Amino acid sequence: NEEILTKALVAEFANAFDIPAAEVRMAAHAGWEELLQSRRDMEAKGEEVLDWLKQTGRRGIVLAGRPYHVDPEIHHGIPELITSYGFAVLTEDSVSHLGKVERPLVVTDQWMYHSRLYAAASFVKTQENLDLIQLNSFGCGLDAVTTDQVSDILTRSGKIYTVLKIDEVNNLGAARIRIRSLIAALRVRDQRNFERKVVSSAYHRAVFTKEMKKDYTLLCPQMSPIHFDLIEPAIRSFGYKIEVLQNHNRSAVDVGLQYVNNDACYPSL
């Protein structure tokens, strides 16, 4: 938000460096305009590459990562590895403006990066000459949310979803195998004239109505034994049927391993 940023900069520079407020506002506006222009340049370059792909009949990979993945010390040359196989590489922010996310999503979409990522995936699923590879580093718990959602957007429409888990170790062996496997799968699909059907990724929630209050039981996940043992009788006092699910047994662990992303940490849930 340019207004909030400008106010913060005026307060900081006026107090610490005695710089006139008008000068700070002018500089902040110029910087903000440059930021917006850089984004427009990125989008224009993305459209340019997409046009080139159509003209040449080539394929492209949207390499989706967090902002720190532009650092060569973190991505370990994966973009160059992909281009060595004859694919063009695009970032998610170069194509996200072309995609429209069908809502609501399964996840809570409240972060700008996540929204951009879902928009990029929504665009990729409509393009036959594009696929997406998502980078994941440091076991980020929030990426456990994004990887599941991006996978859902792509696979529902018949796209192959690939995530590369990379860390500080400079070893491209596993990444190379995953990328070559993706390329091989795409070639097999082309040979077999595989046809996809693009479908909506919107999630249709069942709404709990007043009529359900009498006959339906609310199932509550056990997130904290101390607190949730108090929540159950509190909600029942309002006339709801509720059962807090117990998770201190082997079957609960097995179900969790089957349906929950192994990288999901408590804050991400």
Predicted regions span which residues?
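An N-terminal assembly and electron-transfer interface module characteristic of large anaerobic redox
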Residues: 1-269
